[in-house]
Amino acid sequence: MAFSKLLEQAGGVGLFQTLQVLTFILPCLMIPSQMLLENFSAAIPGHRCWTHMLDNGSAVSTNMTPKALLTISIPPGPNQGPHQCRRFRQPQWQLLDPNATATSWSEADTEPCVDGWVYDRSVFTSTIVAKWDLVCSSQGLKPLSQSIFMSGILVGSFIWGLLSYRFGRKPMLSWCCLQLAVAGTSTIFAPTFVIYCGLRFVAAFGMAGIFLSSLTLMVEWTTTSRRAVTMTVVGCAFSAGQAALGGLAFALRDWRTLQLAASVPFFAISLISWWLPESARWLIIKGKPDQALQELRKVARINGHKEAKNLTIEVLMSSVKEEVASAKEPRSVLDLFCVPVLRWRSCAMLVVNFSLLISYYGLVFDLQSLGRDIFLLQALFGAVDFLGRATTALLLSFLGRRTIQAGSQAMAGLAILANMLVPQDLQTLRVVFAVLGKGCFGISLTCLTIYKAELFPTPVRMTADGILHTVGRLGAMMGPLILMSRQALPLLPPLLYGVISIASSLVVLFFLPETQGLPLPDTIQDLESQKSTAAQGNRQEAVTVESTSL
C-alpha cells in the first residue's frame, strides 16, 4: 500500500491528473466509432435483383410504368414487397391482370440474382454490403466481419497484457494508437472483402492495447478517493462517443468517408500520448526506482507540490521494499489460479466478463432490427449510456462496487426479458426497454472497470486485465453469433441474453469481495491483509449484533 502514500506526496489530485484524464478522453471518444462502425458502414440497404427490363434503359418499354415493370420482373417477397434475392426468369405479363393471384406464377419461374443487385442509396450512398454484395446467400459474411474484428480485440487483449508488463504501459499505448490509425485508414483501399477483414483484425488488435494501457495508466496514477470519479468521467466520454457516432454517420453516408473519420484522429492521439509519464508503480515493480522517482517528481512539479523535492531514492526504496521484493518473485498467468487469495476472484471475474459482454454486444449490434431511425437510435443509446455512467460515481459512493455491479447486471437482464413480452407492433415500448437495458449495461461496465483494477495487485494486474479482456471478447464474439439463431428460434437470443446477465449478477454477489474505500493493492500480501481485516470486521459485527440482542 506504500505507493499510495508516495502518490499523495506528489499531489494526489491536481493539474496532472486533470490533464491525464483529458488526454484519455480523446481515444475514449473515438473508440466507439471503430467498434460500432459497422452498424452503419455495413448497414443492409434495400435491394432487389438487377433485371434487363428495369435496369437496362434501352430495353425499357416507354408505355409501361416502373411499378408495372417491377411487377412482371420481380416476385413478391415474404413481406409482400419485391423479393430481395430472386427474379423471374421471363417477364410474367399475366401479373398485370388485376385479377391475378399468387398462383399465377411458381417458384420454378424464378432464379437467383445472377446479374447482381440494385441497391437503395437513399439512406447510404455506399456500404461494404453493397460493395461486395453481402446479401442473400452471402449475408452470413456480414456477421463474420464483426466476429473477425472482435477476435482481433480478443487476441490483442492477451498479447498486450503481457507486453505492457514487460515493456511498460506508455510505449504500448502510443504504438497501439498508431497501429489502429494505419490499419483503419488502409481499409478504404481494400480490394477484396478478405483483405478488408484482415485490416479490421489488425485495427482491433491495436484497439485492445489502447484499452489496457490507457485504463491501467489512469488507475495507477489516481488516488483511491478519486478513482471512481475519474473512471466514470472516462466512461462518460465513451458514451458520448457512441452518441456522436450517430451524428457522424448521419453526416457521412459513404462508408469510406466514415471509416476515415473514425481512424485518422488516432494519428494525433499517438503523438499526444508521448507526454504521459510511465507508470511509477510499474517502474518500481520492475526494479527501476531511479526512473520511478523521476516520474513522481515530474507529476509533483506539474501539480505544484514542492514537498516532493525532498523525496530521495532511499526514501522511495524504504517505502516500497515490499513491492520490490514482490517484483523478484516470478509471476505468470497461473498465479491467478494457483494463489489461493486470487483463485476465486479470478474465476468469478472470468464468468462476469464473459457473460456481461455476450449480452451487451448482442444488444448494441442488433441496432438495425429495431426498425427505427438507426442514426437517432445510436444517439439515444449513447445518451442513455452517458446518463447511466454519470450516475455511477454517485451510486458507488453510497452502495459500493459489488452491489452496483450485481444490481446493474440484474436490471439489464430483466429489461431484456421484459422486452420479450412486448408485441412487435409496440416498437416504442420495445425501444424503451432496450434503452433501459443499455443504460444498466453502461453502469455495469463503468463499475467493472474500477472493480477489476481493485481486485488484483500490481504484479498481476495487467496480466489479469489481459486475460479478462480475452475472455470478455470471447463473449463479445458470441453475442452477434447468437443472433443468427433468431431465424429458427426468435425468442432464443433475448432469453439467453437476459438469463446470462442475471446469473452473472449472482456470481458477483456470492464470490467477489467488496473493495470500496480500500487502497489499490500493490502485492499479494496486501490482498491477504484486506481479507484478514474483512474477516475480523465481520466477526466484530457479529459480536456487536449478538451483544445488542442480549
Swiss-Prot record:
The chain crosses the membrane at residues 11-31, 143-163, 175-195, 201-221, 232-252, 257-277, 347-367, 379-399, 403-423, 431-451, 464-484, 491-511. GO terms for biological process: monoatomic ion transport; organic anion transport; prostaglandin transport; urate metabolic process. Residues 531-550 are annotated as: Disordered. Changing H47A: Reduced cell surface expression and estrone 3-sulfate transport. Reduced cell surface expression and estrone 3-sulfate transport. One of its GO terms (cellular component) is external side of plasma membrane. N-glycosylated. Contains several complex-type N-glycans. Its main location: membrane. It holds the Pfam family Sugar_tr. GO terms for molecular function: organic anion transmembrane transporter activity; prostaglandin transmembrane transporter activity; sodium-independent organic anion transmembrane transporter activity; solute:inorganic anion antiporter activity. Residues 32-142, 196-200, 253-256, 368-378, 424-430, 485-490 are extracellular. CDD domains: MFS_OAT. Residues 1-10, 164-174, 222-231, 278-346, 400-402, 452-463, 512-550 are cytoplasmic. InterPro entries: MFS_dom, MFS_sugar_transport-like, MFS_trans_sf. This is Solute carrier family 22 member 11.
